[in-house]
Regions:
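Conserved catalytic neighborhood of penicillin-recognizing serine enzymes
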Residues: 64-95, 179-197
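Short, well-structured active-site flanking segments
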Residues: 46-59, 156-163
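Acidic helix-start/capping segments at beta-turn-to-alpha-helix junctions
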Residues: 55-67, 134, 167-170
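Short active-site loop at a secondary-structure junction
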Residues: 22-43, 53-54, 76-84
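Second-shell loop/turn segments in exported
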Residues: 24-31, 65-72, 80-84, 94-103, ...
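Penicillin-recognizing serine hydrolase domain
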Residues: 1-5, 104-220
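Solvent-exposed, polar/charged alpha-helical surfaces in well-ordered, non-transmembrane soluble domains
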Residues: 19, 38, 42, 46, ...
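Beta-lactamase-like hydrolase cores
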Residues: 1-35, 50-52, 109
Length: 220
């Protein structure tokens, strides 16, 4: 029977060869919601050390939408921020990462766009690190597949997106330690055999978005 897809755009790619096996509106520019964070994580891993300690700003904490439960003035490692970014889809974590690497989210977005060009992601434009809606923030299903194929070559990226759960540690301004448990929002990790996970996303404008990778008998 013909494939019934409700998604506006979809692509199935062989990760080894990069060959597109199936495409529905694969080159159509669409909003991407939190799948943006695939690029945020990639830029973070390529331009910082996992053991870097980040002091969380009030700006990061005040970011709307899904949260990694950061607190202003708390100190947290870049590694823990990356898990909060991908498992809890923390918009606050995205801003904290951006400010650590580039001082402002605008400068970080330019970093994201430069990385996109360098990796052959040519029909995508980033305005922010978390995917909150902006008419000038868009991608294509094909670009997300290419980006994820590239990012999964990074072992730390692969380790983070395939984790079901992670406990982060924050040093609070008063000297106390606060642990936060992150649970991966991607249900396919449990429900689909061989799923590596990658990133879910949702905004009212973008609808439900998903980028996922699967390994079956060594093929991805």
């Amino acid at each position: 029977p013909p494939l019934k897809l409700y998604a506006q755009g979809a692509v199935l790619m062989d990760a080894t060869s990069g060959r597109v096996l199936y495409s529905k509106n694969g080159e159509e520019q669409l909003p991407m919601a939190s799948t943006t964070k695939i690029m945020t994580l990639l830029v973070a891993l390529e331009n910082s050390n996992p053991e870097d300690v980040v002091t969380v700003s009030k700006t990061a904490v005040s970011e709307e939408g899904s949260s990694a439960y950061l607190k202003p003035g708390a100190r947290i490692t870049m590694r823990d921020l990356c898990y909060g970014l991908m498992l809890n889809s923390g918009n606050d974590a995205a801003v904290a990462i951006a400010e650590h690497i580039s001082e402002t989210t605008d400068d970080f977005a330019e970093f994201m766009n430069d990385t996109a060009k360098r990796t052959g992601i040519l029909n995508t434009h980033f305005v922010n690190p978390n995917g909150l809606h902006d008419d000038n923030h868009f991608t294509t299903a094909s670009d997300l597949a290419r980006l994820t194929r590239y990012a999964l070559q990074n072992d730390t990226f692969r380790e983070i997106v395939s984790s079901g759960m992670y406990t982060s540690t924050m040093l609070m301004p008063d000297g106390t330690i606060q642990n936060v448990e992150y649970i991966n929002h991607n249900r396919l990790l449990k429900e689909l055999d061989g799923c590596i996970g990658v990133k879910t996303g949702f905004t009212k404008t973008a609808g439900r978005c998903l980028v996922s990778a699967v390994n079956r008998n060594g093929a991805e």
